[in-house]
Amino acid sequence: TAQLYLDQFSSGSTDAVVSALKEIEAADAEALILDLRGNPGGYVNEAVGIASQFLKGGVVYIDRDADGKETPQNVTEGGIAQDIPLVVLVDGNTASSSEIVSGALQDAGRAQVVGVTTYGTGTVLGEFALSDGSALRIGTVEWLTPKGRQIWHNGITPDVVVERASDVQPLLPDAVRDLTPTEVKSLADP
């Protein structure tokens, strides 16, 4: 089983994930854990690109404007990891584009989502200039999962709820990258 941690959806994230997926495939991994815990989101086009690596077709998410008009955002064909068994890890800090990806994979029955309910961002903010030079930012479009579930204020509810005990601190890859094995062992619970 391979684990792929994605800390944000920045420019080039899809290309980086494709490269990682090729390495995972070459290593003959039997399953993949996509870790989106703590991921605040980012560029929605990168979310579409990444979700599309795992989906054979269909919709990644739906835009719904203030008039209620819904516009589906479709999968980009040619994904390279459409058959590997998949689990997506989420937490309360999984937001925005991360919710699009986890919701799309969950709705398609493509992945089991594990963790706690995500943040519940789910909107596009429009900025409007005011006469005094300031600006007003308000939600102009909301995101729905492919099955029409509202992300805003609801988040993505995991298939399997696993809450972190209050006395356990998360250990993220960057936090342990430079530690020796002895230092990592000293962090383990008694």
Q: Model-predicted segments: where are they?
A:
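C-terminal "post-core" interaction segments
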Residues: 1-190
